[in-house]
Each structure stands twice: as C-alpha cells, then as structure tokens.
Amino acid sequence: MARYIGPKCKLARREGTDLFLKSARRSLDSKCKIDSAPGQHGAKKPRLSDYGLQLREKQKIRRIYGVLERQFRRYFAEADRRKGSTGELLLQLLESRLDNVVYRMGFGSTRAEARQLVSHKAIVVNGQVVNIPSFQVKAGDVVSVREKAKKQVRIQEALGLATQIGLPGWVSVDADKLEGVFKNMPDRSELTGDINEQLVVEFYSK
C-alpha cells in the first residue's frame, strides 16, 4: 500500500478531526470543514456500525502517525505481546518512532517533515546518524540535528513555533544545540484525548 500524498484536508474531513498533518502555522481548523464529509457538497456522514467506528478509529490513528497498514498491524501485534494495556502500549510504540520524536522535539513542523529529515540523514541518535523513520527511540536517548543540517531555515522555524506552543513533558530540548532528550515514554494521560485506542484493540480482537 502506497503512502497517501493527496490533500490533507480530505483526510481530516473523512476522520472528522484535525490529524495534525499540517504545521500549527497552517492549522486545518479554520480552513477545512472538518464536520463535513469529503466531496464538493460534503455529503452527510452515515451512521456507522460498531465495526465501522473501530475501522475509522484505526485509520485515524494510523494517519496521524503516518504509518502504513502493514506497519500498524505489526505495532499492534507487538503491543499485544507485551504485558500491560495493549492500547496504551500501541500508542507508546508509535510515539517512540524516531520521526515522531523528531516532530515532538520541534525539529519538524509536521510528522511528514520530520520523517523527511530522518530519511535525508539530518538526524543523529546518540552520536550516530539514523535514517530509519521507524527506529525505536528509548528513554534517555539523545536526538539531535546533524551539524550540516542545523542551518536549515525550516528546522529553525519549526522549533521556534513548537517552543511557543509548548513541548511535551516527555522530551527536553536545548534550542541552541538543536539537541533533545527522550526522557521517558509518555503516560496515556499526556497524549491527546481525541484518540480512542480501545476501539483499535476491539477491531483487531475480532
């Protein structure tokens, strides 16, 4: 399955919520009719069955983190294998992806931009260049922008905006060094409440 490269607004309208696919500078809230379904006239959304709700939630979370279906299924299998709340563990696995950590630290204005920085070898983890977006970051890992990439205007602008909005509590960032520490896995209470991961658990448990 190829990665979706079409209009971001269309996806947000389909899921009925901002998927954070654009930077905070260009928030979808004011530009997309999120309450309307995709299409010229925004057809009325049909009432969904339990299965439909579970499927939509899975698709929403998958799109927020920019993960393909096969990858997402593997993350769920790994979360289900571990001890603890499967839904919360799933979110933690997604949150600890390198591209997501780069985004959370403010080095990329969107997860897609952060993924590009990683793929283009602009990111260093514990002193080593890592170009795999799905690389799993561990508590205590130091993530920084590679020296030759530090002058990129988009990185400076993204970090400036992220600092204004506020960085999450599970990362710390030195803006002067363009370096951050992944302090710990986030608790469920620290993540957005607009996600119902239990529906995903129910979807895969059928």
UniProtKB/Swiss-Prot annotation:
The gene is rpsD. It holds the Pfam family Ribosomal_S4. Keywords: Ribonucleoprotein, Ribosomal protein, RNA-binding, rRNA-binding. PANTHER family: 30S 40S RIBOSOMAL PROTEIN, SMALL RIBOSOMAL SUBUNIT PROTEIN US4M. This is Small ribosomal subunit protein uS4. Belongs to the universal ribosomal protein uS4 family. GO terms for cellular component: small ribosomal subunit. One of its GO terms (molecular function) is structural constituent of ribosome. Coiled coil: none annotated. One of its GO terms (biological process) is translation. One of the primary rRNA binding proteins, it binds directly to 16S rRNA where it nucleates assembly of the body of the 30S subunit. It comes from Neisseria meningitidis serogroup B (strain ATCC BAA-335 / MC58). SMART domains: Ribosomal_S4, S4. Residues 96-157 form the S4 RNA-binding domain.
